[in-house]
């Protein structure tokens, strides 16, 4: 199955990136969370949202509803530009993307252990090193039918993004080799 020919023949079948979600679990609030906010906003160009602890854990000195992490959702051109930088950092850390990182709808996740692997980031001893998880969600044109308020309809199975399509898209657009399990 050649996806490139199918995408040229039918442009509505070509997948696109719906959103890129960046998650950073700091594990504690205070100064460490504030510096992590600065780091992640510098990398992404957007202000992060704080995530709260779901339960109390006295061993780690965490109380329920205490901010302990950050998340940012990127869409459109910002998401594509960030993903290029993220793949640069991912390959710089010597990691590989495997097929088991993709779900059946083509969405995938990967982690970056050190933020200093990103372009234009330097190590600062006062800041430290932060890692992050990056989740990429795919869709095809026409998904607004599923989200709209009036005359909402389901997307047929043939129009959903498959795992193979997403892998092919990542390999052709970003030049990342996806390894078999």
From Swiss-Prot:
- PROSITE patterns with a match to the protein in the record: RIBOSOMAL_L5 (PS00358)
Q: Which GO terms describe its cellular component?
A: ribonucleoprotein complex; ribosome
Q: Which SUPFAM superfamilies match?
A: RL5-like
**Disulfide bridge partners, by residue number:** none
**A biological-process GO annotation:** translation
Annotated GO MF terms: rRNA binding; structural constituent of ribosome; tRNA binding
InterPro entries assigned: Ribosomal_uL5, Ribosomal_uL5_arc, Ribosomal_uL5_C, Ribosomal_uL5_CS, Ribosomal_uL5_dom_sf, Ribosomal_uL5_N
Nucleotide-binding among the record's keywords? no
* Keywords associated with the record: Ribonucleoprotein, Ribosomal protein, RNA-binding, rRNA-binding, tRNA-binding
Q: What's the family?
A: Belongs to the universal ribosomal protein uL5 family.
- Subunit and partners: Part of the 50S ribosomal subunit; contacts the 5S rRNA and probably tRNA. Forms a bridge to the 30S subunit in the 70S ribosome.
Matches recorded under PANTHER family: 60S RIBOSOMAL PROTEIN L11-RELATED (PTHR11994)
The free-text function statement in the UniProt record for this protein reads:
This is one of the proteins that bind and probably mediate the attachment of the 5S RNA into the large ribosomal subunit, where it forms part of the central protuberance. In the 70S ribosome it contacts protein S13 of the 30S subunit (bridge B1b), connecting the 2 subunits; this bridge is implicated in subunit movement. May contact the P site tRNA; the 5S rRNA and some of its associated proteins might help stabilize positioning of ribosome-bound tRNAs.
Q: Please state what the protein is called.
A: Large ribosomal subunit protein uL5
Q: Which organism is it from?
A: Methanococcus aeolicus (strain ATCC BAA-1280 / DSM 17508 / OCM 812 / Nankai-3)
């Amino acid at each position: 199955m050649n996806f490139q020919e199918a995408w040229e023949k039918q442009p509505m079948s070509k997948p696109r990136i719906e959103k890129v979600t960046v998650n950073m679990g700091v594990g504690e609030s205070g100064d460490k969370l504030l510096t992590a906010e600065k780091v992640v906003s510098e990398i992404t160009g957007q202000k992060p949202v704080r995530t709260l602890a779901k339960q109390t854990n006295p061993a780690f000195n965490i109380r329920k509803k205490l901010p302990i992490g950050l998340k940012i959702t990127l869409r459109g051109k910002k998401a594509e530009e960030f993903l290029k930088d993220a793949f640069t950092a991912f390959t710089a850390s010597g990691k590989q993307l495997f097929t088991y990182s993709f779900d059946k709808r083509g969405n995938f996740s990967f982690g970056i252990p050190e933020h200093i692997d990103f372009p234009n980031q330097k190590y600062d001893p006062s800041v430290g090193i932060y890692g992050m998880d990056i989740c990429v969600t795919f869709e095809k044109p026409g998904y607004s039918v599923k989200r709209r308020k009036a005359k909402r309809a389901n997307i047929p199975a043939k129009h959903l993004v498959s795992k193979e399509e997403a892998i092919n898209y990542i390999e052709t657009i970003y030049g990342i080799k996806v390894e078999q399990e």
